[in-house]
């Protein structure tokens, strides 16, 4: 069915805007978040400038250097929940930006800049009966229509319902879907943060194992050089394979989060549509998209201990004639034995006193 459009004034919902503004206040400066907005591991948000100020206050030594920005690691506590936030070498610039909050701020500022009485309410008019407004909803055809169409027109044999009833029902359904989607986004964000930490742990463990490997090979003669290169390559391949897998998962989760955030933004904008008929023309499609997005199954996470590189530990207590058979010993921590500065092995521990294996 085709419709024509008429207009009449509509008041804005100032109460909803006030409630939204309260959710966009930074707990430090007590002002609306200023970009960039960063999300802490505890899922609270701060202006990046405010996060930097909190860090400086918690670390007087940094202030004594005359620095106004943080360029390496440190820690501070979240002002909302007191959770300790540990920074990497990038400082507060290593904290992830919350693009969803930034987008909501932009939408809020755009909406709040409009006069409350400047909007016009659109009334869809029935094309079949030009003087009749669209005021009922055909449940059989799932389209808005007018009363005369029900009495005399194409929908006289259809089941209908009042337009406000269907409007409230579908708006409630979309609102519930958005809530589920936002909750899912929070879980995805937490998983991404966890997997980024896994990447860092893999890199740290790999770096530590490489250092141990180099220290031990440096104490041996030239015959070890070829074998050392082979083992380093094996370790590097394993590191790269693990990092590629985890980073691939991060990309998948990130793509899902981006698509979900865009859908949330689109749904929020749709819910702000004050006209029931206009809203209902697009609500069904949005509801289906939100439902489908909330049911998407994401790829699994790395299994527990996936970041471990302990299987690349090397012992140097083997006899010289067996040097070319040295290989990694999975499960060995690589921390029991020490190499003396002159190249001689340190005091043997319980494992080193055992006879060499075959």
UniProtKB/Swiss-Prot annotation:
Homooligomer and heterooligomer. Interacts with tubulin. Interacts with TRIM63 and probably with TRIM55. It comes from Homo sapiens (Human). This is Tripartite motif-containing protein 54. PROSITE patterns: COS, ZF_BBOX, ZF_RING_1, ZF_RING_2. GO terms for molecular function: microtubule binding; ubiquitin protein ligase activity; zinc ion binding. A zinc finger (RING-type) spans 26-82. It comes from the Eukaryota. Residues 168-211 are annotated as: Mediates microtubule-binding and homooligomerization. Zn(2+) binds at residues 126, 129, 149, 155. Residues 334-345 have a biased composition (Acidic residues). It is found in: Cytoplasm, Cytoskeleton; Cytoplasm, Myofibril, Sarcomere, Z line. Keywords: Coiled coil, Cytoplasm, Cytoskeleton, Developmental protein, Differentiation, Metal-binding, Microtubule, Zinc, Zinc-finger. Pfam families: zf-B_box, zf-RING_UBOX. PANTHER family: E3 UBIQUITIN-PROTEIN LIGASE TRIM (PTHR24103). GO terms for cellular component: cytoplasm; microtubule; microtubule associated complex; Z disc. The keyword RNA-binding does not apply. Gene3D superfamilies: 1.20.5.170, Classic Zinc Finger, Zinc/RING finger domain, C3HC4 (zinc finger). SUPFAM superfamilies: B-box zinc-binding domain, RING/U-box. May bind and stabilize microtubules during myotubes formation. GO terms for biological process: cell differentiation; innate immune response; microtubule-based process; negative regulation of microtubule depolymerization; signal transduction. Its main location: cytoplasm. Residues 326-358 are annotated as: Disordered. CDD domains: Bbox2_MuRF3_C-II, RING-HC_MuRF3. Specifically expressed in heart and skeletal muscle.
């Amino acid at each position: 069915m085709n419709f024509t459009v008429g207009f009449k004034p509509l008041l804005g919902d100032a109460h909803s805007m006030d409630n939204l503004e309260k959710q966009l206040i930074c707990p430090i400066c007590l002002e609306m978040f200023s970009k960039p907005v960063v999300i802490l591991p505890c899922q609270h948000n701060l202006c990046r400038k405010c996060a930097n100020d909190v860090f400086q206050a918690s670390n007087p030594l940094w202030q004594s250097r005359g620095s106004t920005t943080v360029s390496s690691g440190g820690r501070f506590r979240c002002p909302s929940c007191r959770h300790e936030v540990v920074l990497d070498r990038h400082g507060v610039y290593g904290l992830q930006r919350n693009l969803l909050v930034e987008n909501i701020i932009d939408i809020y500022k755009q909406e709040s800049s409009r006069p409350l009485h400047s909007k016009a309410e659109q009334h869809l008019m029935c094309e079949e009966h030009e003087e009749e407004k669209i005021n009922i909803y055909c449940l059989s055809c799932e389209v808005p229509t007018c009363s005369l169409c029900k009495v005399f027109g194409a929908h006289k044999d259809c089941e209908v319902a009042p337009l406000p009833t269907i409007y409230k029902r579908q708006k409630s359904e979309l609102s519930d879907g958005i809530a589920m989607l936002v909750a899912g986004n929070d879980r995805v964000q937490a998983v991404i943060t966890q997997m980024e930490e896994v990447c860092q742990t893999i890199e740290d463990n790999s770096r530590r194992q490489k250092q141990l490997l180099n220290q031990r090979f440096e104490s041996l003669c030239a015959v070890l050089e070829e074998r050392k290169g082979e083992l380093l390559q094996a370790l590097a391949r394993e590191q790269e394979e693990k990092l590629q897998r985890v980073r691939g998962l991060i990309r998948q989760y990130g793509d899902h989060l981006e698509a979900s955030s865009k859908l949330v933004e689109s749904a929020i904008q749709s819910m702000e549509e004050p006209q029931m008929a206009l809203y209902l023309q697009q609500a069904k499609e949005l509801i289906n998209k939100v439902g489908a997005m909330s049911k998407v199954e994401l790829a699994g996470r790395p299994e527990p201990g996936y970041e471990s590189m302990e299987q690349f530990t090397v012992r140097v207590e083997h006899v010289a004639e067996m040097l070319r058979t040295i290989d990694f010993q999975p499960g060995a921590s690589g921390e029991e034995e020490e190499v003396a500065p002159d190249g001689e092995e340190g005091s043997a521990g319980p494992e080193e006193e055992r006879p060499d294996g075959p």
